[in-house]
């Protein structure tokens, strides 16, 4: 039976951080043969793994290493002068993470001229700091993960570009950005009574770049009790860093929710959910979920930090893209000189080919502080092949800071909540939504604009209007909403319209229950 296939790509072009302590997974793969190495080589391994019973990887580590505490482990650092390809002055370099309490065995390989060779662990590649250990007696531990370096912000220094560390997590940087949101290879049953399953990248193959290379190719093998997979990552650094992903999955057993291209990020509070006691006005890596449907609609959902876990979704026949964005890029919105939340990148997934019908699912989990990643978003296809049959999909993953993906017309600049001149009852809330963008800037003076709003569930619109804010040029949608049942969440939708012309994306807001 042929693969359930989406078209393939062209040529290269913190969910709580504690969850990185995922269950140990697949066994290490033996050294590769002399056959030419390519994506299909990894896919063959994934298919073979899927046909065999799942076998957890032996996670034993030397007693000396296991006895190290968190700070002692952090004192182990890769020696930069030992970086892969540094001696050859290639544009990309790779350094490795040492295994530790949260980093299970990951096997590394290098691909040169279509031939793969194993990269063994060498204790001499690491500086163990003040730790009094004897790593030369530990044998081949393999590694905990990897990070790629590239001269992203200037020729004098090779910055971190992309990191693969823990389960199937990875994150990247574009020029000028600081680490924020993460992505994963796959999410399995993120919500549910049985708990989430965390697939792991258990083996990587790093393709040696040419001396003038502008992109780096990485292959990875994914494994878990119910899914195996082959991945190809083509990383193109720049003002916008592009990671083009090709994947082929094989299910060992059925899963309830298969989440493709998952994002993980943090939202503690912001202008739509202010904090009373912190001097910082906002604390978040991302402030909204943006979705583009195949029907041409653009949706913006402001993120929230709920009391109880909230799972919502946007169903559609076709997906044009979705992403977790940090639209507010003003330092004064955060006032954090260390975290610099205004420099956190946005991530946008652009499917390659048709992904068919499905839904974008958003999971929001309450968090007391900024140390936990509490937001997850991913695509769930309606149709998943049965165990043993392949599922192919590809996408472009855009990491952006200076030029964010936006709708072609108007888009939400901010969402604020709270009373104005008039007091609010316990079952009422007022929402202030500012829209900006080319479709609004081009309106002639005096153009009539109206707010089109609805409360599809548990809400009554008491007042809604739209007007231009003279000080900023934005158009403001103001609505007052009553909640019949204050214990339940309320879905709200709104956009601006002039005559028959829709001027903006749809503001899709979730007002949590008490």
Which role fits each region the language model picked out?
Residues 39-40, 47-192:
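Solvent-exposed N-terminal domain segments of exported/luminal and surface proteins
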Residues 1-13:
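N-terminal secretory signal peptides that target proteins for export/translocation
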Residues 71, 163-165, 177, 256, ...:
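A contiguous, surface-exposed recognition patch within enzymatic or periplasmic domains that forms
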Residues 34-70, 74-79, 98, 333-514:
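Terminal accessory/anchoring regions of large secretory-pathway or extracellular enzymes
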Residues 220-266:
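Acidic, contiguous internal or C-terminal segments within carbohydrate-active enzymes
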Residues 180-238, 356-364, 368, 372:
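Extended, loop-rich substrate-binding clefts of extracytoplasmic carbohydrate-active enzymes
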Residues 18-30:
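Bacterial N-terminal signal peptides
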Residues 107-114, 243-253, 395-397:
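Beta-strand cores of secreted/periplasmic/IMS beta-sandwich domains, seen most often
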């Amino acid at each position: 039976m042929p693969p359930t296939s989406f078209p393939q790509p062209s040529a290269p072009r913190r969910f709580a951080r504690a969850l990185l302590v995922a269950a140990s997974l697949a066994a290490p793969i033996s050294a590769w043969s002399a056959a030419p190495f390519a994506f299909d080589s990894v896919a063959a391994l994934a298919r073979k793994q899927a046909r065999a019973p799942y076998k957890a990887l032996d996670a034993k580590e030397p007693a000396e290493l296991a006895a190290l505490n968190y700070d002692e482990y952090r004192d182990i650092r890769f020696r930069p002068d030992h970086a892969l390809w540094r001696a050859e002055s290639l544009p990309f370099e790779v350094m490795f993470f040492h295994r530790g309490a949260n980093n299970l065995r990951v096997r590394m390989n290098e691909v040169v001229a279509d031939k793969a060779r194993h990269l063994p662990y060498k204790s001499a590649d690491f500086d163990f700091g003040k730790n009094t250990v004897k790593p030369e007696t530990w044998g081949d531990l393999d590694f905990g993960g990897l990070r790629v370096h590239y001269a992203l912000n200037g020729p004098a220094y090779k910055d971190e570009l992309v990191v693969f560390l823990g389960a199937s997590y990875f994150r990247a940087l574009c020029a000028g950005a600081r680490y924020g949101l993460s992505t994963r290879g796959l999410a399995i049953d993120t919500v549910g009574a049985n708990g989430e399953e965390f697939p792991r990248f258990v083996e990587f193959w790093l393709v040696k770049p040419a001396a003038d290379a502008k992109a780096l190719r990485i292959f990875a093998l994914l494994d878990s009790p119910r899914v195996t997979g082959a991945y190809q990552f083509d990383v193109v650094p720049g003002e916008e860093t592009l990671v083009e992903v090709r994947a082929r999955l094989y299910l060992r057993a059925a899963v309830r929710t298969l989440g493709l291209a998952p994002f993980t990020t943090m939202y503690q509070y912001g202008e739509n959910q202010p904090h009373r006691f912190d001097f910082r006005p906002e604390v978040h890596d991302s402030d909204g979920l943006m979705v583009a449907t195949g029907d041409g609609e653009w949706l913006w959902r402001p993120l929230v930090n709920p009391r109880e876990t909230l799972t919502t979704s946007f169903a559609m026949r076709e997906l044009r893209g979705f992403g977790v964005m940090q639209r507010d890029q003003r330092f004064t919105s955060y006032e954090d000189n260390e975290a610099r939340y205004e420099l956190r990148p946005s991530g946008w997934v652009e499917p390659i080919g048709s992904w068919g019908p499905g839904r974008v699912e958003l999971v929001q989990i309450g968090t007391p502080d900024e140390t936990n990643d509490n937001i997850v978003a991913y695509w769930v296809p309606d149709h998943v092949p049965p165990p043993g049959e392949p599922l192919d999909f590809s996408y472009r993953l855009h990491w952006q800071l200076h030029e964010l993906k936006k709708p072609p017309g108007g888009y939400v600049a901010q969402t604020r909540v709270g009373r104005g001149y008039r007091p609010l009852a316990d079952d009422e809330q007022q929402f202030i939504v500012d829209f900006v963008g080319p479709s609004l800037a081009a309106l002639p003076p005096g153009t009539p604009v109206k707010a089109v709003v609805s409360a599809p569930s548990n809400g009554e619109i008491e007042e809604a209007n739209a007007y231009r804010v003279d000080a900023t040029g934005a158009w403001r949608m103001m609505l007052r909403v009553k909640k019949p049942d204050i214990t339940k969440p309320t879905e709200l939708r709104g956009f601006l319209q002039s005559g028959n012309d829709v001027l903006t994306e749809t503001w899709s807001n979730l007002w949590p229950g008490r």
